[in-house]
Amino acid sequence: MKKIFAMLMLIMLVCCGCGKKLDEVSTTTDLDNIMKRDVLLVGVKTDTYPFGYYDQKGSFSGYDAALARIIARGLLGSDKKVKFVPVTASDRMMKLYSGDVDMIVATMSITPKRQEILDFSTPYYTAGQAVLVRKGSSVKSLRDLNGKKAIIVFGSTSERSLRSAVPNVGIRGYKTYPEAYKALKIGRADAIVSDDTILLGLALKDDSVELLPKRYSKEPYAVAFRKGKESKELIRAVNNIIEIETHNGNLRKIQETYGIK
């Protein structure tokens, strides 16, 4: 995780350095580029049901994908003017700074560390850290993981909160949630620690695992952007869309569609 942040900081500094030289001849913003292209490029996950996944037809589905379509409609006049780019928790920031996407809508929570290299919209959902175990497990709370092994997904916020709450836990990291889930099932660790909404998606599909009831944090999900003045106009536009869709009840209806509380 530290290597990823160091690399992104370097990329950001290089971009900022180049930007200073171009200020006198270019005032192009990220929103200008989107409007000119007439397509919104959005990074979404495919392994985090019910937020981001492929449906039976192989199409991008979930709350995050639905929000991305709403943003495309608000910016470009049509929810079909969006191109989805699959991302994972470990590669989403790299894809943003490489220019593969204009924004990330992928269960990404706001943290002080991330705010050093990213700008965020206003939150569109609040999750909480939780624990998923095999049924019949002796683990009944986060603290029961002392002296045991827990699984996290690289790029998520789980490792930080887990080490703080359970100093003597052994941590196994995986790149994707399917890999983490498989590791739990075959007994490579005692639990997965992650956002409750993501873990609930796994538990709903398999009655051999269960989600423990307690939540250990608040994780505000927001749309993520490249840090810098080029993103400011785009962020304002997205914030306005989120505010409108929140007040008119559309975001709540989408949450209910996907069984999200």
Language-model features: where?
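Ligand-binding clefts/hinges and TM-proximal coupling segments of bilobed small-molecule sensing domains
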Residues: G19-S26, M35-K36, E159-Y174, D207-R215, ...
